[in-house]
Amino acid sequence: MEALTMPNSFSAGDSPFYQFPSPAKLNLFLHIVGRRADGYHELETVFQFLDFGDNLSIRRTTSATINLLTPIEGVSNESNLIVKAAKLLQEKTQTPFGAEIKIKKVLPMGGGLGGGSSNAATVLLALNLLWQTKFSYNQLAELGLQLGADVPIFIHGFAAFAQGVGEKLTPVHPDESIYLVSKPNCSISTQAVFTAKALPRNTQKLDIKAIDNKNYLTGYHNDCQNLVINHHPEVAKLLAWLVEYAPSRMTGTGACIFSRFDSEIEAKRVQALLPPSIKSFVTKGVNQSPLHQVINHLSIE
């Protein structure tokens, strides 16, 4: 894919703040097909984006400083993927510019929705544009992989069948369904899931040509789900309740559960029945990232 470009008239000085979405993702299924010698797991999964997520406000500065103006509770700025992504691109491109970044955080941490990876990808794509560093999507994805296995899918921005550690992507076209996404009152450690002895690691590999784009919730599974529900009764209880209303599955390593509905009205009807303590939202699955819709249409006067 071609590198992002900006008009030559935007070539110096501080910029205004620009708004960039940082969408959530779903793993419509997640199969673990092996483990590499370096300890990383070989995965097969289908990623789809959600028309819902965090929002980042980003501006370019003539100072080389990377300044996150809205720190996230419990996460130091230096360990935040937002700051790490900006500094990594700055280092690799040797740009003289810096950035000021604000985030409106709505995606839960420890939910399996890819919030941190999405934030990192949004920063890489936005600053590549604002700094005019002209890296290609493939180059940005290589940088992103240093930050997390899910970052490349957010860089490329299309629904995909992913293999390897999640970096080998083949476009797919799942139905853009309506989902109710619900979060139990717990957070799941991805590291704890992937280091658990009870985690299945030998699911048979799929033939991508035979993948059914319409039946992800019936023909496939999430290898992490049984492990998580056995250790987290909050997840087990919520999942058991949701499947009475719609096909439902945990995304990623959890804890969020997505339920597919035929209409927004029906999804919101079930959402209204959830206990107030369960955070949830209704949205649509989309096969192009909302971030890329902004990047592709952004014009600066």
Predicted segments — roles?
Residues K102-W131, P247-F261:
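Glycine/serine-rich anion-binding loops at beta->alpha junctions
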Residues E2-G110, L129-N138, V165, H173, ...:
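ATP-binding N-lobe of GHMP and related small-molecule kinases
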Residues L28, L56-I58, I82, G116, ...:
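Residue-level signal for inorganic ion chemistry
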Residues G98, L124-F161:
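Contiguous, small/hydrophobic- and glycine-enriched helical/loop subdomains that border
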Residues H156, A160-P247, R260-E301:
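Conserved, helical-rich catalytic subdomain that frames metal- and/or nucleotide-binding sites
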Residues T62-V75, L145, D212-H221:
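Short, basic/glycine-rich phosphate-binding loops at helix/coil junctions
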Residues F49, L145-Q146, I153-I155, T170-D175, ...:
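Solvent-exposed alpha-helices and their adjacent loops that cap or buttress functional pockets
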Residues T5, V83-G98, L125, T218-K237, ...:
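A short, flexible low-complexity segment enriched in Lys/Arg and Gly/Pro that occurs
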